Structures are given as C-alpha cells and as structure tokens.
Swiss-Prot record:
PANTHER family: C-1-TETRAHYDROFOLATE SYNTHASE, CYTOPLASMIC (PTHR48099:SF5), C-1-TETRAHYDROFOLATE SYNTHASE, CYTOPLASMIC-RELATED (PTHR48099)
MF terms in GO: methenyltetrahydrofolate cyclohydrolase activity; methylenetetrahydrofolate dehydrogenase (NADP+) activity
Record flagged with keyword Protease: no
Gene transcribed to yield this protein: folD
Keywords: Amino-acid biosynthesis, Histidine biosynthesis, Hydrolase, Methionine biosynthesis, Multifunctional enzyme, NADP, One-carbon metabolism, Oxidoreductase, Purine biosynthesis
PROSITE patterns, A to Z: THF_DHG_CYH_2
Domain of life: Bacteria
Record field: catalytic activity: (6R)-5,10-methylene-5,6,7,8-tetrahydrofolate + NADP(+) = (6R)-5,10-methenyltetrahydrofolate + NADPH; (6R)-5,10-methenyltetrahydrofolate + H2O = (6R)-10-formyltetrahydrofolate + H(+)
Species of the source: Prochlorococcus marinus (strain AS9601)
Name this polypeptide is given: Bifunctional protein FolD
C-alpha cells in the first residue's frame, strides 16, 4: 500500500509546537509575533487564502494585520504602506498576497519588503541567499515539501528528482533547495521534450505544472515518490457541484508509487505552516530568543 504524506496532520503537529514556543518566549519578547498581509483587489481565491492564514495565525498565537486595499489604489501608495510596515516593530513578517491586479509592478513591490520580514522568500536578497546557499527566508511551499519528505525519512541526497514547473513561487526555489540538499535535480516545463520519459527517471517527482490531472501512470516509475503541488476546482459529473484535484491523476498512479501527497490536505497545509515558521523565525532573531525553532521541524 502506498504511503500517504499527510500534510494536514503534520501541519497540526508543528502548529502545536509553534504555539508552545510562542507561549514560552512571549514574556521575554514582551509581545507575540506579528504578520502583515497585504491584499489588493477582490480575487476570490486570494480572499480564501488570506482567511486561512489569519485563522492559522490565531490558532498558534501570532497577531495578524490584514490590509485589504481597493484595486483603485496606486502603486506608490502600496509602496508607502510596505515602507511603513518595514519600520513597524510589532510586525515581524510581511507578505503581498498574490496574484495582484496586472496594473501593479509585482516584483517592485516585493523588492520594497525588508528581507528580514519577507516571509514568502521572494525578495531578490533572499533569492540571492538561496542561490548562494546562505541562511535566509525560504519560500513556503518548497520548504513545506522538504519537511513533508523529512517527516517520513525520505532521502533527498543522491536521489534523482524531477520538478515540473519553473515558477518563482515553487519550481525555481524548490529546485535550488533540493540541489543544496545534494539531490540530483532536473527542472522541466511545458516546452520540455518527451516530458513523460524524463519524469519516469525520477525517484521523486514533484508536479507544479498548474495543469489538472496532467500526470498519469506513464510519467511515473515503480516505487517513486510523487508530490502534487497543483490545486484545481473542476466541475463534477453533477453540474451543480465542483471537486478539487491536483496536477496528478492519483487513481491512475497510486498503485505504482511508494508515497504520494493528497489534494487537498498535502502540500497546501504545509505551505501555511512554513509561513508561520518564517514569521516566528524573524521574531526569534529580533529578540535573540532560544534558537531551538529548527528542533520543532522534522
């Protein structure tokens, strides 16, 4: 039977440890950690994600600051808000909820976030630190994936790992993080020739293509580990209902794989948990708190 990499279960276990960590250190710091989330416009999915982050913060004792801006706001006004939050001593972490309306220069806004508060790990300073394998904020989804693998003692070093997707949010930082852990990494994308043949070489296959049910059994070798980053809402046979699925056609591959992540309940919960970890990491550094935070992770 294939091993289910249960991100929801692991995230709750880590959240309990994070809650204890905050409780044990907030008297020394004289405040709890603070996370600022900037949302622009009315994208429905963004509303759900921001709500999930706010709830997660509440569960473990992080104070959240939600700034919901109208789409009519100007680029300069958002930049000024970010600069103001950079100097706010009650805020340890900050993120710009993506996607944002196309009229904004996304990367310029992110570049204004203080690297020590950049809990999404998207500021060019943190990306540069990742490339150089120096300590810094790491992107949440890649970090969540690595901790999922570690939680089940799945070895990265020396393994052939294929990453499908080259986004700045997942594919690129994940490939670098795996490379830094001595994985043998192949990054693929929509223009890769013979994609299924390349994927069949993988000991660990990570699907972040953004295409529902792309990966079937022809992409997967016997005994592989498969990580599904995709999440899509499709119409079910009952036209009034929808269902969630990933990039992987799970029912077609499950008999071949050693381990897999479900959708939902796999990578998604761990992404939010690593956001909490990054926020607490920034808080910890600011106050010189106990450096046992890494001991709370797999």
């Amino acid at each position: 039977m294939s091993l289910k990499l249960d991100g929801k279960k692991l995230s709750l276990e880590i959240e309990k440890r994070l809650n204890d960590y905050i409780s044990n250190n907030k008297i020394i710091a004289k405040r709890v950690p603070g996370l600022a989330v900037i949302r622009i416009g009315e994208d429905p999915a963004s509303g759900v994600y921001v709500n999930n982050k706010e709830k997660a913060c509440s569960r473990i004792g992080i104070k959240s600051f939600i700034f919901h801006l109208d789409e009519s706001v100007e680029q300069k006004e958002v930049e000024q808000l970010i600069i103001k939050l950079n100097s706010d001593k009650d805020i340890d972490g900050m993120l710009l909820q993506l996607p944002i309306p196309k009229k904004f220069d996304e990367q310029k806004l992110i570049s204004h976030i203080n690297p020590s508060k950049d809990v999404d790990g998207l500021n060019e300073i943190n990306i540069g630190k990742l490339v150089k394998n120096e300590p810094g904020m790491r992107s949440c989804t890649p970090a969540g994936i690595i901790n999922l693998l570690r939680s089940q003692n799945i070895t990265i070093e020396g393994k052939k790992i294929v990453v499908i997707g080259r986004s700045l949010l997942v594919g690129k930082p994940l490939s670098l993080m795996l490379l830094n852990l001595n994985g043998t990494v192949t990054m693929t994308h929509s223009k890769t020739l013979n994609l299924n043949k390349v994927c069949r070489e993988a000991d660990i296959l990570i699907a972040a293509a953004g295409k529902p049910n792309l990966i079937d059994s022809s992409f997967v070798k016997e005994g592989a580990v498969i990580i599904d980053v995709g999440i899509h809402r499709l119409k079910s046979s009952d036209k009034n209902q929808t269902r969630l699925c990933g990039d992987v056609l799970l029912e077609d591959v499950i008999s071949k794989v050693f381990a897999y992540t479900p959708v939902p309940g796999g990578v998604g919960p761990m992404t939010v948990t690593m956001l909490l970890v990054n926020t607490i990491f920034s808080w910890q550094k600011q106050f010189g708190l106990s450096s046992t935070l890494n001991d709370l992770l797999p």
